[in-house]
């Protein structure tokens, strides 16, 4: 894939190939803005899966080891490039179906993440997920991060909305539970699962109304920022724009900036 996501006065790097790293590094250095790395920073040949794949809660110990190797590599480069934090997924559709095993693996993963955060002196934000499997409740993610100052939650607004729909939960209640522990936000919009399959991550825009089926971005941001106004905000869209951001996309970014500045 290879995405450089624009944020509010920052960037996030995700899933580059090695041959694109030169251009990426010179762009990042020229901007002199803070940036984060989303695991994998780049996808090495030993990981022949998609960038969003994680095996931390998988039954296969060899696959689990691969995911730990990948996050370690991303942390190494994040430290070297002076990124200010790392974002990782925790759950995936191939997670173990054994509930007790998932809880044991989660506990083990948490201790490994704490060690990594301490070793590299870098915070880790765990992106909320859970379309399937036993680890999908906001409270579970809060428990995962709350005892270590370097761990926090990344609320992905689009995914959180889709998951609350699948799980028959109240979206804003889910947001409320996680907000006090949230350190970063992935911002994009959707009208639901079918819409998402067709359009993927739609750039936010003030013209998107909740009554038309869109996620209420303003209300969502206001809840999260009410607990932590310093959350890092990333626009997680389907394109790497570098400096060529389309006008409509830019309008949405400015709108979010206004919402943030009012908090």
What are the language-model segments listed below?
Residues 4-5, 22-29, 72, 76-79, ...:
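Surface-exposed alpha-helical segments enriched in charged/polar residues
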Residues 56-152:
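Active-site acidic/histidine proton-transfer and metal-coordination neighborhood
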Residues 2, 83-84, 142, 147-154, ...:
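Histidine-acidic metal/acid-base catalytic patches
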Residues 1-73, 79, 152, 258-263:
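N-terminal pre-domain/capping segments
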